[in-house]
Structure formats: C-alpha cells, structure tokens
C-alpha cells in the first residue's frame, strides 16, 4: 500500500501539510481488515457478569517483569540507527549505535534545539509520541485542535478538528492505527489514522459518559481497554471492541489528573487534585490502595517504562517516588514552597532522568535513582507572549529528545549537549 498516495485523500476532518510520511500500521503489523476492532457480543456480555473482567484476563498471557523489560529493549532497538541530521548536528554524534546502547554522560546538560512558535492558537495542553516508529508526535491544544508533527523535522503533517473545546489528553495505540483524544467538551473521540477514503471522515467513534472535562487517559498495553478520567472525579473503563462503558471506578474526591496502565498489578494507577494516588483492582472495580503522602493537589504522575516504579509531583513542588505493586515510598525530593506548581513529569528510561515542568516555566532534571538535581533551567516565552507555563512533556522513545508543550502556544524540542 502506497500510503503517500492515499493520504492525499485524507478525511475531511484533517487538513494536511505538504510533507506526509506516516507509518502504515496495517503493513507494519500485517493487520487485515478482519483483524480490526469490531463489536464482540461475547466480550460485552462477559464484562457485565459477576466475574467482571475475568473473561478478558484469562485470555492474556501474563508476563513477568523481566519479560516486560526485554520487550521494551526490543522496541528500542528497532528504532532508526541513524538520527536525522537536523537533530544530530545539535547533539553528540550517535553514528550507527543502537538506541538501547546510548547512555549519555551524567554531567551532560539539556539544551533547546528548536522552537515551534505558533504551533497552536492556544495553550498546548497535551502531547504523545508515536510508540511504534518514533517518527511523529501528536499535540492537543486549548484551541480545540489536534496536530500531528514529524519528529525529526518538526514539519506539520496533519491538523485534526472535531472537538469544540480544548484537548487535554491524548493516547496513540501501539496495536491499531488509532488516536484517542479527551476534551473539555466532555467527549472522548477515536480517530482512524489510516481511514483515508471514508466519506464519514477519520473520526470513527465517540465515547459519551463523562459529565465534566476529560483530563487524563491511558490505553491498556495488552487488553482492548481505554481508561479516561477528568473533572467528574471518576475513571471510566471502555471496551474498545463493543464501544461500551464497562465500569466506573469511584473514590477520588476531585479532578483526575493522570492515569497510568501496565500489564502487571495494579493495572490502573490514578492521581487526583484531592492529593491522593489510587491503585485499582479492575477485576473487582475497587481501590486496592490509596496513597495519601502528598499534602497538596497532584497534577502529574509518570510511570517508569521499564521498572515497577513511578513518580508523582504536587502543587507545592514535592516529588515522590513509589515502588509497585505495594505502593511503598522510595524517595522524596524536589523543592517545596509557594509558586512551585508541578504541571508535568516525564521519565527518560535510557539514562534514568526525571523531567519536571512547572507552572512558572521552570524546568528541572533529576537523577531518578538518587533524586539528585542534575539541572535547573527555565523556558523563555516566545516574542509577544508572557505565558511561560509548561503544561505537558514527553521524551521520545530513544530518550534523545524532550518535547515540551507550553502556555505561549509553542512546542519546544530539547536535546542533550
């Protein structure tokens, strides 16, 4: 399939820029049309019986922690060996090394590589990187649009419209050519990135049920389940096959700010503005454990991609590292005080660096193992703007680039010296 040709007739919801080179998931994974998500009456009936999700779980090959880590390494070694010249000239040469072999020096510093000024017409509130090829990333904005960008060149690949309010959360499937978005308009939408010849457009599904804005979402890494949460303080679990809401997880007393999903237990972890983190047993639809160590609202939480650990940050500048599945507190660091609101956290597994982005534009890089502060910096608003907040961030899959989404309507790309 020549994707460069069929993308020219992309659905009416997407406006394309001239440069198009998006991955074909059907080719990459050898997926046939019959393999795509379709309603399953058997599954729908099963999730509503007394056993809840037992039907799903009994069909999943459970893997131990070592196998999960091996899979993450295999994904990394499939990434391109030669980095794009536009990025490489600003960074140390990586030559033909495998991405998994790259271990930057501990004394290296992150510096600004590129400013995508005017990337959106409003605050840039969410971002995520393509988990399959590491070639593109997606951003959502308070201007209600979603944009897809080439990671190497930062060229705009597509603009997706359909939400009527700001886009606060995004998730890209690693199993299907689907993008999910959550908005302040209380809707979750599913976009088919390869449905280019459909007269109905690329928006293929709506998930209705939330009564407030949707601020967080996550896809289960193995099961066809989507988790969403937001202002209504509950987490809704959606069956992607039957398109139905299969359960509601209640317990938080304020906005849901982050959701993380993993293969092992606890399969769902959430953070909230009520200053708690909850670990959920989704087989029983109950809270397995509530962590109450934070004294202020938690705006961000990040899970280590290769370890059973996670980190959370609150509005007083405190960072806490946790061990899973038991929720033991491993470390506390950060700088507590006023005006130290942490909006976003990201973990770079290639060198165990934790990035913390603040509401006042400050940026901090920590050694994830020791909690030592490695670098403290600040972003500079683009000309004509006084907004400096960093709202969202993510490392690419190689760990060589950091993407920050900011209040000055820009996107910034950072790399190590």
Swiss-Prot record:
Keyword set, alphabetical order: Cytoplasm, mRNA processing, mRNA splicing, Nucleus, Repeat, Spliceosome, WD repeat
Pfam family, one: WD40
Principal location listed in the UniProt entry: cytoplasm
WD repeats: 119-159, 162-201, 209-248, 251-290, 293-334, 337-376, 385-417
GO biological process, one term: mRNA cis splicing, via spliceosome
Coiled-coil ranges from the UniProt annotation: none
PROSITE patterns (alphabetical): WD_REPEATS_1, WD_REPEATS_2, WD_REPEATS_REGION
Function: Involved in pre-mRNA splicing and required for cell cycle progression at G2/M.
Family per similarity comment: Belongs to the WD repeat PRL1/PRL2 family.
Name of this chain's protein: Pre-mRNA-splicing factor PRP46
Gene source species: Debaryomyces hansenii (strain ATCC 36239 / CBS 767 / BCRC 21394 / JCM 1990 / NBRC 0083 / IGC 2968)
Lineage, highest ranks first: Eukaryota, Fungi, Dikarya, Ascomycota, Saccharomycotina
């Amino acid at each position: 399939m020549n994707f460069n040709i069929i993308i020219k007739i992309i659905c009416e919801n997407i406006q394309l820029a001239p440069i198009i080179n998006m991955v074909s998931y059907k080719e990459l994974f050898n997926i046939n049309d019959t393999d795509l998500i379709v309603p399953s009456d058997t599954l729908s009936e099963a999730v509503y019986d007394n056993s809840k999700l037992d039907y799903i779980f009994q069909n999943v090959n459970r893997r131990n922690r070592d196998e999960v880590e091996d899979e993450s390494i295999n994904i990394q070694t499939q990434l391109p060996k030669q980095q794009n010249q536009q990025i490489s000239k600003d960074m140390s040469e990586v030559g033909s090394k495998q991405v998994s072999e790259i271990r930057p020096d501990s004394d290296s510093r992150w510096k600004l590589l590129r400013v995508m000024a005017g990337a959106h017409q409003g605050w840039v509130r969410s971002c995520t990187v393509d988990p399959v090829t590491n070639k593109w990333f997606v951003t959502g904005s308070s201007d209600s649009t979603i944009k897809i960008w080439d990671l190497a060149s930062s060229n705009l690949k597509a603009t997706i419209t359909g939400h009527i309010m700001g886009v606060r959360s995004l998730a890209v499937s690693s199993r299907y050519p689907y993008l999910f978005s959550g908005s302040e308009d209380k809707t979750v939408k599913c976009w088919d990135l390869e449905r280019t010849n459909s007269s109905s457009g690329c928006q293929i599904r709506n998930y209705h049920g939330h009564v407030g804005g949707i601020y967080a979402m996550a896809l289960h890494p193995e099961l066809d389940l989507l988790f969403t949460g937001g202002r209504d303080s509950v987490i809704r679990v959606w069956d992607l096959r039957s398109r139905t809401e299969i359960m509601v997880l209640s317990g938080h007393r304020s906005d849901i700010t982050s959701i993380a999903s993993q293969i092992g237990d606890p399969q769902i972890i959430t953070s909230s503005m009520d200053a708690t983190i909850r670990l959920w047993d989704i087989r029983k639809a109950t809270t397995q454990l509530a962590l109450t160590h934070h004294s202020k609202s938690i705006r961000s939480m990040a899970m280590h991609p290769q370890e059973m650990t996670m980190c959370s940050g609150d509005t007083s500048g405190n960072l806490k590292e946790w061990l899973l599945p038991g929720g033991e507190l491993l470390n506390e660091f950060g700088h507590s005080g006023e005006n130290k609101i942490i909006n976003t956290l990201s973990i770079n597994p290639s060198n165990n660096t934790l990035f913390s982005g603040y509401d006042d534009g400050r940026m901090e890089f920590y050694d994830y193992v020791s909690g030592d502060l490695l670098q403290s910096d600040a972003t500079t608003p683009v000309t004509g703007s006084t907004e400096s907040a960093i709202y969202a961030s993510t490392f690419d899959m190689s760990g060589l680039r950091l993407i920050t989404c900011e209040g000055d309507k820009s996107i910034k790309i950072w790399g190590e010296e």
